[in-house]
């Protein structure tokens, strides 16, 4: 995928360098260079935009024989391009442009201009006529252009330095980054408006058709628009397939590297041309991973494939398949071969790698008979290499072997090189061959092929001159090469070098490569020349290695992209350039050695966190107190510096929140106020203990920040209600029954003593304490109600009946004691503290009910003559104790600067019960006993009377 470079210029158009042109047949054809505007195909390494120009001139000399003189007229083919003041005529052959002329001396009679060209005839004496006039015949010019692509209208949509010069001569181990492996995506690269046009083109005056004159500055241009699907990835490929008669390039063979550029010179795809299949395979760079919606158009310089399209004035089908889109067009080709010329030559091709000129010369096409034939080649700016043994002489056995395209099939020729001696002289810049080789006469025909290599020491643009010195005429032919649009030829034999090295993860951030630190895969690396023009781009392999190859001596710039999640480490640490980091952009100098020291280190960008706490500020002081608790469920939003929301969360049950995986930078934290709460005071104390407010700006610089807090307190309503209810019930019931029956004739004495004692004690104590502290109104209401009822009932009934003649003694003693004690104690304490209204209501109700019932019944009946003694003793004791204690209290905290109001209401006292009716009960009891005794006495007297 790397864009290769030769010695001095890119495989494309590089400003201020020499591109050489071959000049042929008397004149120079001007070759215009197409300047790429946006997207460039085929600007592969160091291609000269070559046009071939050949010059020849024929001079007549004296002849010993005499004959009637004959005028020969040399006519120019294209009057617009010749400076000679000659008569104009038209010819259906390639036009010529005038350049440096060479003198050709020839003695002949009745000379005909080649290929229907009408020449300006000068006077020629033959036989007995002698002339000294010189005549010149103008032949076609041959201009060849090499690969040149003009690109247009590229549009893309983006998907997302200090230079330190140095010169390094050390050698390093070359580890080439592994190429991306992709798939063929011919179906995802779409071409439209495909066309093959002739530039400039020449119109045949006879047929009216435009022809491609391959040796007269014409080139072919392949044009098309295209779009690239967004699904295409780095490493994917697509192809250009050229047909049988059509190839990229010009006189100069297409380079192996054919790259695709955008308007800014960035490489979109790297192409490799295979001359065997006549196919270019393009591999996409990481450009397509960085941009979407890539579309544009291009123009690519192309040429007729000489080995197949061999014949002048013949239409050939020029066909090309771009991706999956095929286009073809028939083009008439003319190379301008002049079959009547004893000496004619052409640049067969220019080698793309070493820029050597591979020349072909046709000797004695007319099959003249000579007694002298000396073939001499003089090089200017070039040299022969005798050791290469590429100076070949072939004898032609079939006239058809002089093919018009100057690319004969040498396998069908007779190689007679060993029969001749090639004499090199002038520092291998001159080669001389005697084609007679001791023969007295010969009409043999030859095809001579040579290779001329650029001479590094020469400052001239270069020229190749041929002469064929015969016994009749001395023919000269010249091929020269000139500059075009500031381009220059490269020195093909200059050595190429490599540049690159390593991208690694600097885990300890020390700026140095350590043994345990590993490379980073997938980092984009871009190579630029000293003018900032992109030459190549690549991606680091799985070991972090990258390399650019095929580079000449010079200064280069290398740019590294920062991989996602990493930060560039410190650059230029220490003195060992081989193990330091050179930063994101660095400069490397190649001087007669590889430079494998351009490294860049990165460390994983640390991630940080921020957050802390949202709490309930019960005392409204704006400070976090140890007794104050967090608030759950508060929404917190995090924004970046652009105001974009990058995270939301809610506080947990402890009021805590946090945001993680944050880079250093500026952020904003926004707290959403909980319903019913009020923002507390801000920035009242240390940053980790205060409230920061509803929106907080924060900057993270290589550290976490857990000081972003906020506090709230409850809004202005507080209500405290305390109710206390105490109820006590006591019931005491005592029943006594005594029955005595005595019948006697004796005396009866009845004594009844009844004692009933009921004691009720009720004690109710209610204490209500309400404490309210508020900034506004506080209302505390405490109600205490204590009710104690005591009921003691003692009933004693004694009945004594005695009938006797004897004494009767009845003693009845009834004692009823009822004691009721009810104690109710209610304590209500309400404390309310609020900014607004505080209402404390304490209600205490204590009810004590004591009921004591004592019933004593004594019945004595005595009927006897004897003594009867009846004793009834009733004792009833009822004790009831009720104790109720109620305490109600509520404490409501509030914030600073509020006032407190206290209200206290006294509890109602419980009524005393159980003591007021004791005397009346005792009176009733004793009255009843006395009545009973009276009845017994009366009843006894009546019985005595009856008896």
UniProtKB/Swiss-Prot annotation:
Domain CNA-B: residue ranges: 496-606, 607-717
The UniProt record lists the keyword Methyltransferase: no
Motif window: LPXTG sorting signal: 910-914
One Gene Ontology cellular component: extracellular region
Residue list for modification Pentaglycyl murein peptidoglycan amidated threonine: 913
Annotated Basic and acidic residues bias: 72-83
Biased composition (Acidic residues): 685-695, 712-886
UniProt name for this protein: Serine-aspartate repeat-containing protein C
Source lineage: Bacteria, Bacillati, Bacillota, Bacilli, Bacillales
The encoding gene: sdrC
């Amino acid at each position: 995928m790397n864009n290769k470079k030769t010695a001095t210029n890119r495989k494309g158009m590089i400003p201020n360098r020499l591109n050489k042109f071959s000049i042929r047949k008397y004149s120079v054809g001007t070759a215009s260079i197409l300047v790429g505007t946006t997207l460039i195909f085929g600007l592969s390494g160091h291609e000269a935009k070559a046009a071939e120009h050949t010059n020849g001139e024929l001079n007549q000399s004296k002849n010993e024989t005499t004959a009637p003189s004959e005028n020969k007229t040399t006519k120019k083919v294209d009057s617009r391009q010749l400076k000679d003041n000659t008569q104009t005529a038209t010819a259906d052959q390639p036009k010529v442009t005038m350049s440096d002329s060479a003198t050709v001396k020839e003695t002949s009679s009745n000379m005909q201009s080649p290929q229907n060209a009408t020449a300006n005839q000068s006077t020629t004496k033959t036989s007995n006529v002698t002339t000294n006039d010189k005549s010149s015949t103008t032949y076609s010019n041959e201009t060849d252009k090499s690969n040149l692509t003009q690109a247009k209208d590229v549009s893309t949509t983006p998907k997302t330095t200090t230079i330190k010069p140095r010169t390094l001569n050390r050698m390093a181990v070359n580890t080439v980054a592994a190429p991306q492996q992709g798939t063929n995506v011919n179906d995802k690269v779409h071409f439209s408006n495909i066309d093959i046009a002739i530039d400039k083109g020449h119109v045949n005056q006879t047929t009216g058709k435009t022809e491609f004159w391959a040796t007269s500055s014409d080139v072919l241009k392949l044009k098309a628009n295209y779009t690239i699907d967004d699904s295409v990835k780095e490493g994917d490929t697509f192809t250009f397939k050229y047909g049988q008669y059509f190839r990229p390039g010009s006189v100069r063979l297409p380079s192996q590297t054919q790259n695709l550029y955008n308007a800014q010179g960035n490489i979109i795809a790297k192409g490799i041309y295979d001359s065997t299949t006549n196919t270019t395979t393009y591999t996409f760079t990481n450009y397509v991973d960085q941009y979407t919606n890539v579309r544009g158009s291009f123009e690519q310089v192309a040429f007729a494939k000489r080995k197949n399209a061999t014949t002048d004035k013949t239409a050939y089908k020029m066909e090309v398949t771009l991706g999956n889109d095929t286009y073809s067009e028939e083009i008439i080709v003319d190379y301008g071969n002049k079959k009547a010329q004893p000496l004619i030559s052409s640049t067969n091709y220019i080698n793309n790698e070493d820029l050597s000129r591979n020349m072909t010369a046709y000797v004695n096409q007319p099959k003249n008979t000579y007694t002298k034939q000396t073939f001499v080649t003089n090089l200017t700016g070039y040299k022969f290499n005798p050791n290469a043994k590429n100076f070949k002489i072939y004898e032609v056995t079939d006239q058809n072997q002089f093919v018009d395209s100057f690319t004969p099939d040498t396998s069908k020729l007779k190689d007679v090189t060993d029969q001749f001696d090639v004499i090199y002289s002038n520092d291998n810049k001159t080669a001389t061959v005697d084609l007679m080789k001791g023969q007295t006469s010969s009409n043999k025909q030859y095809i001579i092929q040579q290779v001329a290599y650029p001479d590094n020491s020469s400052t001239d643009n270069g020229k190749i001159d041929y002469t064929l010195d015969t016994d009749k005429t001395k023919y000269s032919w010249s091929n020269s090469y000139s500059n075009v649009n500031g381009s220059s030829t490269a020195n093909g034999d200059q050595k190429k070098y490599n540049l690159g090295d390593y991208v690694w993860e600097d885990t300890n951030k020390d700026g140095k490569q350590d043994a345990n630190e590993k490379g980073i895969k997938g980092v984009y690396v871009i190579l630029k020349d000293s003018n900032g023009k992109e030459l190549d781009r690549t991606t680091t392999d799985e070991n972090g290695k990258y390399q650019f190859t095929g580079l000449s001596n010079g200064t280069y710039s290398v740019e590294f992209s920062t991989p996602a999640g990493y930060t560039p480490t410190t650059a230029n640490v220490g003195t060992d350039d081989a193990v330091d980091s050179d930063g994101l952009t660095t400069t490397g100098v190649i001087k007669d050695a590889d430079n494998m020291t351009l490294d860049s280190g990165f460390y994983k960008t640390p991630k940080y966190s921020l957050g802390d706490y949202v709490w309930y500020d019960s005392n409204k002081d704006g400070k976090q107190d140890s007794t104050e608790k967090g608030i759950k469920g508060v929404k917190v939003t995090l924004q970046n510096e652009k105001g974009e929301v990058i995270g939301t969360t809610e506080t947990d049950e402890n009021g805590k929140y946090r945001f993680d995986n944050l880079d250093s930078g500026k952020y904003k934290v926004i707290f959403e106020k909980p319903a019913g709460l009020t923002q507390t005071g801000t920035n009242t104390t240390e940053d980790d203990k205060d409230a920061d407010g509803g929106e907080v700006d924060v900057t993270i610089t290589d550290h976490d920040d857990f000081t972003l807090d906020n506090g709230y307190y409850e809004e202005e309503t507080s209500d405290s209600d305390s109710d206390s209810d105490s109820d006590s019930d006591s019931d005491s019931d005592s029943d006594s029954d005594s029955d005595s029956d005595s019948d006697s004739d004796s005396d009866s004495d009845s004594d009844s003593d009844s004692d009933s004692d009921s004691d009720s004690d009720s004690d109710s104590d209610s204490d209500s304490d309400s404490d309210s502290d508020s900034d506004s109104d506080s209302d505390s209401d405490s109600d205490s109600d204590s009710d104690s009822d005591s009921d003691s009932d003692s009933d004693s009934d004694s009945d004594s009946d005695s009938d006797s003649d004897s004494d009767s003694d009845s003693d009845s003693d009834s004692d009823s004691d009822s004691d009721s004690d009810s104690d109710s104690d209610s304590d209500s304490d309400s404390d309310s503290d609020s900014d607004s209204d505080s209402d404390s209501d304490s209600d205490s109700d204590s009810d004590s009910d004591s009921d004591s019932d004592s019933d004593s019944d004594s019945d004595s009946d005595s009927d006897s003559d004897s003594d009867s003694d009846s004793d009834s003793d009733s004792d009833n004791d009822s004790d009831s104790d009720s104790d109720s204690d109620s305490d109600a209290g509520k404490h409501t905290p509030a914030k600073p600067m509020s006032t407190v109001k206290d209200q206290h209401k006294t509890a109602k006292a419980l009524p005393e019960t159980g003591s007021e009716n004791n005397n009346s009960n005792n009176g009733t009891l004793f009255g009843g006993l006395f009545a009973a005794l009276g009845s017994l006495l009366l009843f006894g007297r009546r019985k005595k009377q009856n008896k």
